[in-house]
Amino acid sequence: MRKNESQRETKETEVSVSVLLDGTGSTTVNTGQPFLDHLVSSLGKHAMFDIDLKASSRDGIVHHLVEDVAITLGGAIDKALGDRSGIMRFGHASVPLDESLSEAVVDLVKRPYHRIEMKIKRPEVEGIAKEDLEHFFDSLLRNLDCCIHLTVKYGNNDHHRVESAIKSLAVALRMAVSADPRREGPPSTKGSM
């Protein structure tokens, strides 16, 4: 069973998360930030990960909460993948949300690189600063320890841009973490990821 339970406790926040990669998309998320809850729930729902995440701020600073949720969640997914043997490794998805379109391309090789183009226009979306939303994706992907290109192609509504981005990432991750029944060991000519 590909599962991980992780905690992160600092003077700024307290975060606990349980992730089951081979789940049904069931999520229970409570961070105190409704849009952050929505993003994490959307990731779980469309990646088919079961996610139970609780987070609280100790200092009242939204940036710290957003960052620590992403760090803990990304790390938990990474740990749940183990040595990444027998997985598809690659995934890609284009996902619309009304007028917005996003694309995610994933390689679960353990070489961290990511490029994110969000194209958020407003200073904040649903009570979270633009730079904190961008930092959420950055921290999540950095701690997932893989290579991901995530691009919002276009859109007029910033909420839709961000939501289509998380959903395209989720669908691409679902593909990449899927078991490959024909593969034994790591999906790499090197013999390890």
Curated annotation (Swiss-Prot):
Protein name listed in UniProt: Imidazoleglycerol-phosphate dehydratase
Pathway in which the depicted protein is active: Amino-acid biosynthesis; L-histidine biosynthesis; L-histidine from 5-phospho-alpha-D-ribose 1-diphosphate: step 6/9
EC number: 4.2.1.19
Coiled-coil ranges (or none): none
Keywords, comma-separated and alphabetical: Amino-acid biosynthesis, Cytoplasm, Histidine biosynthesis, Lyase
Keyword Ion transport in annotation: no
GO cellular component, one term: cytoplasm
